[in-house]
């Protein structure tokens, strides 16, 4: 009897135990597995997102660092360019200043040299003019002597005819209102005209002036009264100096390459001036 009770009790306990333990359900197991898989996928997805966020953050930081480096490099390059440009400008300014000083000093030295050369040329010109004056005076003396001899002969010839030559000879010996006096006065005026120029232009201008002198002397050789033609030479020297100064300026401008043209034009101006003198000189015969 006790055995049956124990067996029954064991059976009851077994039944209770079986009843209290959950019966495994396949659907619940599948649900749990799916939930676990979803949780694992969510965790993986979260890890991937976190990793992507980290990569993006790292890329952003890298780009920011690169931008800062580029900005710094550009700033340094600009600073170097500015420094270089300032240095170049300063160097150019210094070089320009030195060149300006050199040019100014060279111009001063050149001006000093030209002044010294002009003084020397002036001394040489003065000597040459003195020589030319001596030669012209000697020529003038010879011509005066020849004119006086011719006047004496004419006076003798005319004195034999009617005594007219004696009056002319007397006026010639007196040196006033005579052809000889007119000649001397005109020569004095013409010889007083000077050409201020440097060689080789000066000699060419003097040759052109010589045409004016010779032609003028030939036109007044028979004029008895110088007082009638004296006004014709009032501004002659001034006009010649204007023409000569213009010739010097033009020759200096072309640096001597146009000296032939300048000399020929000056001679033409002297010929024109002679033709302008002719009507005035004709008044001495009346």
UniProtKB/Swiss-Prot annotation:
Glycosylation sites: 116
Record-level Gene Ontology MF annotations: collagen binding; toxin activity
Keyword DNA-binding in record: no
Biased segments, Low complexity type: 166-177
Main subcellular location of this protein, as a coarse class: secreted
GO CC, any one term: extracellular region
Highest taxon, organism lineage: Eukaryota
InterPro entries listed in its UniProt record: ALL3/gSG7_salivary-like_helix
Subcellular location: Secreted
Residue spans of biased composition, Acidic residues class: 24-69, 103-129
Gene Ontology biological-process annotations: suppression of platelet aggregation in another organism
PTM per Swiss-Prot/TrEMBL: Not glycosylated.
Disordered: annotated segments: 17-179
Record's keyword annotation contains Glycoprotein: yes
Signal peptide from the UniProt entry: 1-20
UniProt keywords, alphabetically: Glycoprotein, Hemostasis impairing toxin, Platelet aggregation inhibiting toxin, Secreted, Signal, Toxin
Tissue expression as described in the entry: Salivary gland.
Protein purpose: Inhibits host platelet aggregation induced by low concentrations of collagen via blocking the von Willebrand Factor (VWF) interaction with collagen.
Similarity-based family: Belongs to the aegyptin family.
Note: Does not interact with host vitronectin (VTN), fibronectin (FN1), fibrinogen, VWF, recombinant platelet receptors GPVI (GP6) and integrin alpha-2/beta-1 (ITGA2/ITGB1), thrombin (F2), and coagulation factors Va (F5) and Xa (F10). Has no effect on host blood clotting, vasodilation, inflammation and murine splenocyte proliferation. Reduces occlusive thrombus formation time in photochemically induced thrombosis model in mice without compromising hemostasis.
Self-association and partners: Monomeric in solution; likely has an elongated non-globular form. Interacts with human and rat collagens (via a RGQOGVMGF peptide, where O is hydroxyproline).
Protein name (database record): Simplagrin
């Amino acid at each position: 009897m006790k055995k049956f009770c124990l067996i029954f009790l064991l059976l009851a306990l077994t039944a209770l135990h079986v009843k209290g333990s959950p019966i495994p359900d396949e659907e619940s197991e599948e649900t749990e597995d799916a939930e676990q898989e979803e949780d694992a996928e969510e965790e993986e997805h979260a890890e991937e997102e976190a990793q992507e966020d980290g990569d993006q953050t790292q890329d952003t930081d890298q780009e920011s660092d690169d931008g800062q480096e580029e900005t710094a490099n550009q700033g340094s390059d600009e600073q170097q360019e500015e420094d270089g440009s300032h240095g170049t400008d300063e160097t150019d300014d210094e070089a320009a200043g030195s060149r300006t000083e050199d040019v100014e000093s060279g111009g001063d030295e050149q001006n000093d040299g030209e002044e010294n050369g002009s003084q020397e040329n002036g001394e040489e010109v003065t000597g040459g003019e003195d020589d030319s004056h001596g030669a012209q005076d000697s020529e003038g003396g010879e011509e005066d002597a020849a004119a006086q001899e011719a006047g004496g002969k004419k006076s003798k010839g005319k004195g034999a005819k009617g005594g007219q030559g004696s009056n002319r000879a007397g006026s010639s010996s007196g040196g006033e209102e005579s052809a000889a006096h007119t000649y001397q006065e005109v020569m004095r005026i013409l010889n007083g005209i000077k050409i201020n120029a440097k060689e080789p232009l000066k000699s060419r201008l003097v040759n052109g002036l010589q045409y004016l002198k010779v032609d003028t002397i030939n036109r007044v050789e028979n004029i008895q009264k110088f007082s009638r033609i004296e006004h014709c030479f009032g501004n002659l020297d001034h006009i010649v100096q204007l023409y000569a100064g213009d010739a010097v300026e033009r020759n200096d401008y072309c640096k001597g390459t146009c000296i032939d043209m300048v000399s020929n034009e000056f001679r033409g101006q002297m010929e024109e001036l002679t033709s302008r003198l002719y009507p005035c000189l004709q008044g001495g015969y009346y």
